[in-house]
Amino acid sequence: MLKTIMKTLSGMMVLLLMVGCNQGVDKIVIASKPMTEQFILAEILTQLIEDRTDLVVEQKLGIGGGTSNIHPAMINGEIDVYPEYTGTGWLFVLQQDPISDMNELYEKVSIAYLEEFNIVWSSMYGFNNTYGLAISKDVAEAYDIKTYSDLATVSSELVFAANPDFYEREDGYNALVEMYNFTFKDTKEIDIGLRYEALSSDDVDIITVFTTDARINEENVVIIEDDRTYFNAYHGATLIRKEVLDENPGLFDVLELLANQISNEEMIAMNYEVEIENKDPKVVASEFLREKGLIE
């Protein structure tokens, strides 16, 4: 009789464990790189997931080293979700040659990540945070500069500035100059946080920017067109371990609610609210999600 009871209890325990597994994990870990945009995106993901699922989110925000430390942690299962950029995945992680077509890039990086790392890319958010070149409004009007090709015709009269890393990157200064035949009057190294001040003070004429920078819409800043598409696309999207998706049916559909929902203008505005107006990323994320009707 005792043996029968013990067998019954053992069977019930196994059944309970199986049911628990089928219900999925209770917690997922969301990470971000140490930059304003990533803090906002991580908050958007956190609030969306907690509103639309029964999952509890643990945040690991501002991880030093960014992709170089987050990616191995995802492979090891220490991190489940984080926002990434197509160009970073393709060029930095996979070490592949640049692809100018954004859709081809997305397709190839998605396939490679799934095959090599068992990591899934969501659809792209919509915005493209790539490199760009900015000049002052006065310079743009004085020289009639609208494109990089326009800039090339007068580059010998202008001073170019970028952060030190840009001069060292394979896809940075030297290759850019070669493609467009720039012959700048002078070049300067400048801290990434001082670029816009340098442009405003007329210390330099051209600066490198990221195309979702908080200050990119300032009145005196003009972004010129990369008319030969030198810079690779860096479209934002969510990365998630496939194991987590397998354990939580429906989670991918929740992440897909952000597909094509964040334009460059919207990302710039959110970055501006946090960096310049000092708003809490949690508040900015919540306002965005409510405006889009994605949470109540």
Located regions from the model:
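Short helix-initiation/N-cap motifs at beta->coil->alpha
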Residues: 36, 59-72, 164, 185-197
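Ligand-binding "clamshell"
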Residues: 93-122, 203, 215-229
